[in-house]
Amino acid sequence: MAVKPSANLGKAFQLPHPFNSCVYIQIPPQPTWSINEYWERNPNKQYLDESDTTYLEELTLTPIEKHQALEKLNTIISAADRLQEVDTKNVDPMYTCVDEREMYMNSGQDGETVNKEEILGNAHKIFQDYFTAPTSEKMRSSSDLNAKE
């Protein structure tokens, strides 16, 4: 079934074959909302500051331009905050976001299990019973991070 263009939206265009006979995509001529307008309407949103970007820089071992990173991350956070506006009270949770095919749950039958010591035996370094990955020099020098013997 073809979707006809709406008068209040921009021009519609057809997708290339084989979709051109049944699908239209409508693109508004102008953005329908702005992050800045959303921020003004939602004063209780969370922001990141420079100390957060310093911490992220240490975790990733990658130098970042703090001002630019703050702008981008705060924009992403505020965009994600829009999800709070969606009313999901009467919506059943999904087991998967893939709805093109059925996804079956595990039957609950126990299979072969491996104990924690056997799993951690493969770790190069262990921190509080977890595998660790290389991180910043500040974290590597921490007395809590002990190399496996």
Curated annotation (Swiss-Prot):
<comment type="function">
    <text>Allows the formation of correctly charged Gln-tRNA(Gln) through the transamidation of misacylated Glu-tRNA(Gln) in the mitochondria. The reaction takes place in the presence of glutamine and ATP through an activated gamma-phospho-Glu-tRNA(Gln).</text>
</comment>
<dbReference type="GO" id="GO:0005524">
    <property type="term" value="F:ATP binding"/>
</dbReference>
<dbReference type="InterPro" id="IPR003837">
    <property type="entry name" value="GatC"/>
</dbReference>
<dbReference type="GO" id="GO:0032543">
    <property type="term" value="P:mitochondrial translation"/>
</dbReference>
<dbReference type="GO" id="GO:0030956">
    <property type="term" value="C:glutamyl-tRNA(Gln) amidotransferase complex"/>
</dbReference>
<comment type="subunit">
    <text>Subunit of the heterotrimeric GatCAB amidotransferase (AdT) complex, composed of A, B and C subunits.</text>
</comment>
<comment type="similarity">
    <text>Belongs to the GatC family.</text>
</comment>
<dbReference type="GO" id="GO:0070681">
    <property type="term" value="P:glutaminyl-tRNAGln biosynthesis via transamidation"/>
</dbReference>
<keyword id="KW-0436">Ligase</keyword>
<keyword id="KW-0648">Protein biosynthesis</keyword>
<dbReference type="Pfam" id="PF02686">
    <property type="entry name" value="GatC"/>
</dbReference>
<dbReference type="GO" id="GO:0005739">
    <property type="term" value="C:mitochondrion"/>
</dbReference>
<protein>
    <recommendedName>
        <fullName>Glutamyl-tRNA(Gln) amidotransferase subunit C, mitochondrial</fullName>
        <ecNumber>6.3.5.-</ecNumber>
    </recommendedName>
</protein>
<keyword id="KW-0547">Nucleotide-binding</keyword>
<keyword id="KW-0496">Mitochondrion</keyword>
<dbReference type="InterPro" id="IPR036113">
    <property type="entry name" value="Asp/Glu-ADT_sf_sub_c"/>
</dbReference>
<dbReference type="GO" id="GO:0006450">
    <property type="term" value="P:regulation of translational fidelity"/>
</dbReference>
<dbReference type="GO" id="GO:0050567">
    <property type="term" value="F:glutaminyl-tRNA synthase (glutamine-hydrolyzing) activity"/>
</dbReference>
<keyword id="KW-0067">ATP-binding</keyword>
